[in-house]
Amino acid sequence: MTNVLFLWPPEAPLRTYLADGVAGLPQIELVFPPAASEEALLPLAAGARVMVGWRPTPALLAATDELELFINPGAGVQHLIAPFRELNERRPVILVNGHGNSYFTAQHAVALLLALTNRVVLHHNWMAAGRWRLGDAEAASIPLRGRRVGLLGYGHVNRQVHRFLAGFDVEFAALRAAWPPSGEEEPPTALRKFAEGELHPFLEYVDTLILSVPETARTRGLIGPAELALLGAEGLLVNVARGAVVDEEGLYEALRNGTIAGAALDVWYDYRPEADRSGRKYPYYFPFHDLPNVVLSPHRAASPFGDLARWDEVVENLKRFAYGREDLLNVVDLGREY
């Protein structure tokens, strides 16, 4: 029997969707705990061959004598690299992540870009304050036509971004750590490809940068003051990757002093911010909210969370595991950290 332990109690619609997805699989049982607490999970952990969840505690991993596969339903696994490296020193456990939210993340990236270019937030705020039709003097839209869109990372999200933006009169370039020789679907439009060591030529070539790369030791601080300067005074930046990929102070100063024209940000630098004297919480250390050329988003690119199709990759991996297949989806390379 293959027990699949979920690390939280899913709502009824998701339970039904998952159960229907694995119906008929040989010797597989989905185990839904009564609560997400360690107290509720520990008694169930010993018999689990598969776990599905985001943040297993050290005690929980230590209790899993039969664990062979851990499925992280989201893309980000930086918090799991160290514990799974340690676990794999004792016995092999496969870690996979999920890209079921890639469509929504790409949709959000495009929405952020258009909100930034069309100055939607500024004009909304002026109208909400009763300031009617102030014109373009302070907040003219930025045409996309003729721009060079740079996709930093060309995985699940940015490939979808490319499809979404393909109807605009723009050029596309992408930088990827390793370009496959063949076998991957063709891009929807012409794409100039840059290799991992060509970051600076890539940034010199583009003027609109959309980041969707994992956070690893190699990508933390990848975009700093020098890189932002290469993007140029007309440059726009959209980050749906991780905050740590872009140097926070460097980004703030580049926006404040006009090194780049604007940024739209969904990922941040302090995910447990303390409230100020007015009870406000800001997930960053520099006052981005005071800048007129920024669109702020509270790490919600993966919404809507109620979309059940996002779990199809999890179901597919459970099927492959149940049949003893080795070609699991999205296996994480612990050495490369993604």
Where are these regions (language model features)?
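Rossmann-like adenosine-cofactor binding region
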Residues: A178-Y284
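Structural alpha-helical scaffold elements that stabilize or flank donor/cofactor-binding regions
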Residues: L41-L44, L60-A63, P201-Y205, E227, ...
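Phosphate/diphosphate ligand-binding glycine-rich loop within oxidoreductases
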Residues: G47-A128
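Rossmann-like dinucleotide-binding domain for NAD(H)/NADP(H)
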Residues: E234, R242-Y338
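Phosphate-coordination loops involved in phosphoryl transfer and adenosine-cofactor binding
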Residues: M1, R145-R148, E234
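Short, conserved loop/helix-junction motifs that constitute active-site signature segments
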Residues: L60-E66, P83-R90, L228-A233, A254-T259, ...
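N-terminal glycine-/charge-rich "phosphate-binding" loop or analogous flexible N-terminal tail
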Residues: M1-A48, A173
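Glycine-rich NAD(P)-binding loop of Rossmann-like domains
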Residues: H124-Q160
